């Protein structure tokens, strides 16, 4: 139930905030699911829907802010859908589920005097930094630097100007000419 409510909340928010843009509407459904997934097993269905809507608004606004401010193009919106909505979902989960046990079983004596680790905003923020920064951004940046050093990160400038499919189109035109001249 929560999965479908977060999907519908994401679709609804994406449709409204993007001005009926189909790309953002469909992407926002996934962003809503990702945003609400941090606490979907503990949320009420209406909470899942509202949290998904908030996450979609954050992802949409952050996408265009980063694009304008830093001139970074996220052509398919993958960073917005997975990254911004995911971080927003983790932080929202920390506030909405503050004090809930993080697991259903005892893990020993914790620093707060209980035998389980409670969910809290700071812990969720630190988890977001570890997941997205340490396990995502830093390895991605290192791989991009290695690929750039090898000359494999971007296509050549002349191909970029002509268009990536130019060579394929020219090859297919030559093949068509060869076939048509052979049949005459």
Protein language model features and the residues they cover:
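Glycine- and aromatic-enriched membrane alpha-helices
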Residues: 1-184
């Amino acid at each position: 139930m929560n999965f479908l409510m977060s999907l519908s909340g994401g679709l609804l928010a994406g449709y409204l905030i993007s001005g009926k843009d189909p790309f953002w509407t469909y992407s926002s459904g996934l962003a809503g699911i990702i945003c609400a997934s941090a606490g979907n097993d503990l949320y009420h269905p209406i909470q899942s829907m509202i949290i998904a809507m908030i996450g979609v608004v954050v992802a949409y606004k952050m996408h265009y802010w980063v694009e304008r401010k830093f001139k970074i193009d996220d052509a398919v919106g993958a960073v917005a859908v997975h990254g911004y909505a995911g971080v927003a979902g983790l932080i929202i989960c920390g506030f909405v589920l503050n004090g809930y046990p993080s697991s259903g079983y005892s893990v020993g004596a914790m620093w707060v005097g209980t035998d389980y680790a409670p969910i809290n905003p700071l812990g969720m923020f630190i988890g977001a930094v570890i997941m997205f920064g340490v396990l995502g951004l830093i390895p991605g940046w290192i791989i991009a630097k290695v690929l750039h050093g090898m000359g494999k990160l971007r296509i050549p400038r002349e191909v970029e100007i002509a268009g990536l499919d130019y060579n394929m189109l020219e090859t297919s035109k030559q093949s068509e000419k060869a076939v048509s001249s052979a049949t005459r």
